[in-house]
Amino acid sequence: MHRGPIPDFSVLVLKELRRRGWRKAPVVIASNADSCVLSYIDGMAATTRMLRNEAVQLECLTEVTRIVREFHDLLAGADLAGDREVVCHNDLQPPNTIYRRTSGRLLPVALIDWDQAAPGDRLDDLAQLCWRFTGLGRSASCETVRERIAVILRTYGWRAGTQPVTKAMLRCQQKARDQIQVGAGDGDDMFQRLRDAGALESIQRDRDWTKAYLVD
């Protein structure tokens, strides 16, 4: 699969995951300053509303959390993590996840779009999971979202309670909003498209909902 260039660090992360035998991310076939060729992963990204609704169901949540825990554990203590706990993906969401149907069930099989990968803490990606994979928002049931967050944290093995996670979700949402705003202001086409599509307002609504219903 041909695409534009990706950051050098992301290339190193993908190569290290492959070296360690992890097969739930694309393989870098070739990369230079102008373009990158990645292996094709059979399946579909959850880019439609129907698939996104399926992606937040408990079985899918459990499996995608296991995938995140796997690569965190693989890269914990690696040189790429520097002095941080792990290497984080930093853009975990259903459209960046490849799914396949198995016996009629939708299940995640790989993570794509590693452009924002960077050294970080496990909590950073956990916050992304709990924000992007739980269906939170204006029409969401608080009880359902809390149940989904509990499943993510239990599956991951997180034992430090939910409040550090919900506070990290707020930081993650603000960071995403700031990134779009700054990038669009700097003339980046992708961030301008996101801004024009209403991403800033959407993220702010998610942030307001998180504050209102998840932060004790």
Predicted segments, located by residue:
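A conserved alpha-helical element in kinase catalytic cores
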Residues: 1-74
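Conserved kinase catalytic-core helix
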Residues: 50-90, 95, 101-104, 149, ...
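Short, polar/flexible loop-turn hinges at active-site or ligand-entry regions and domain interfaces
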Residues: 51-54, 118-120, 136-140
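Short helix-to-loop capping/linker segments positioned immediately adjacent to catalytic or ligand/cofactor-binding
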Residues: 75-83, 137-141, 160
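Catalytic activation segment of kinase domains across protein kinase-like and atypical kinase folds
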Residues: 86, 94-129
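Active-site activation/catalytic loop segments of kinase-like enzymes and analogous catalytic loops
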Residues: 125-158, 173-183
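Eukaryotic Ser/Thr/Pro-rich intrinsically disordered, low-complexity regulatory regions
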Residues: 165-171
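ATP/Mg2+ or Mg2+-diphosphate-binding catalytic cores
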Residues: 176-216
